[in-house]
């Protein structure tokens, strides 16, 4: 799911449920499969291998002698939110994977996503060209579950609007940025970049943030998580995607972590 190709059965809810079961106690593979897919349901297809593999790739579980155990502190899977923060903290480890590459390419398209094809299924071919490897419609269906869950934006029917507010909020916490402290914007980018290269341009000479990241930062500003500012005598100037309707129309120099 993350190391290579995306698969639709490995949805976040299944991965979380599997982790919660083994958080209670280690299970044999057969026991775990029965709890996840009880025989009385008479399912003709088993998806167990797909979501178990996703959990293993993420380092959430480990298997030894056909016994599956939790591989992280139980707090990492205490809730769907805590599992999301765990995954976001480790996402850069999968930079060669299909999920990472597709997410990176989609955000790099900037606001062009508003004017092109609206169905993720139809975007499989252009995204395949963008990342230089095959992407099919089923893999795009798998992508939508995780890209929404990890906080990169909002899904409306089969159109995905990039707004990385939840992801960025997680990354602010993961990076250990101090509440109440004002940072130059360059300092802020340096702090979050080890966890956010998937959507943040890692060339500091550009000093420009794409549409989805800009949407996320403005949302965090609006709800009081951060305060964006352009202080006139500051030279560390970064550009958001222009939006005249917002108090932060384009340029920023400082950011304060509010909560």
Task: Please tell me what each predicted stretch does.
Residues 1-259:
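Donor-sugar nucleotide-binding helix/loop cap in glycosyltransferases
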């Amino acid at each position: 799911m993350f190391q290579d190709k995306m698969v639709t059965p490995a949805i976040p809810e299944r991965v979380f449920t599997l982790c919660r079961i083994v958080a209670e106690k280690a299970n044999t593979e057969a026991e775990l499969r029965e709890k996840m897919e009880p025989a009385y349901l008479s399912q003709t297809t088993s998806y167990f291998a797909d979501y178990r593999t996703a959990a293993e790739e993420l380092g959430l579980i480990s298997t030894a002698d056909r016994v599956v155990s939790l591989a992280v502190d139980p707090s990492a899977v205490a809730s769907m939110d805590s599992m999301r923060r765990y995954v976001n903290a480790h996402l850069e480890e999968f930079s060669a994977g299909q999920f990472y590459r597709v997410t990176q390419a989609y955000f790099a398209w900037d606001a062009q996503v508003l004017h092109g094809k609206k169905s993720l299924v139809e975007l499989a071919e252009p995204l395949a060209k963008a990342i230089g490897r095959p992407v099919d419609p089923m893999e795009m269906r798998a992508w939508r579950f995780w890209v929404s869950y990890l906080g990169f934006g909002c899904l409306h029917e089969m159109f995905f609007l990039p707004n990385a507010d939840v992801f960025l909020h997680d990354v602010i916490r993961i990076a250990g940025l101090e509440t109440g402290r004002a940072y130059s914007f360059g300092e802020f980018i340096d702090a979050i970049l080890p966890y956010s290269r998937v959507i943040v341009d890692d060339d500091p000479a550009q000093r420009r943030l794409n549409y989805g990241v800009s949407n996320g930062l403005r949302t965090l500003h609006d709800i009081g998580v951060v305060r964006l500012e352009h202080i006139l005598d500051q030279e560390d100037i970064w550009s958001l995607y222009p939006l005249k309707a917002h108090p932060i129309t384009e340029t920023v120099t400082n950011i304060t972590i509010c909560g």
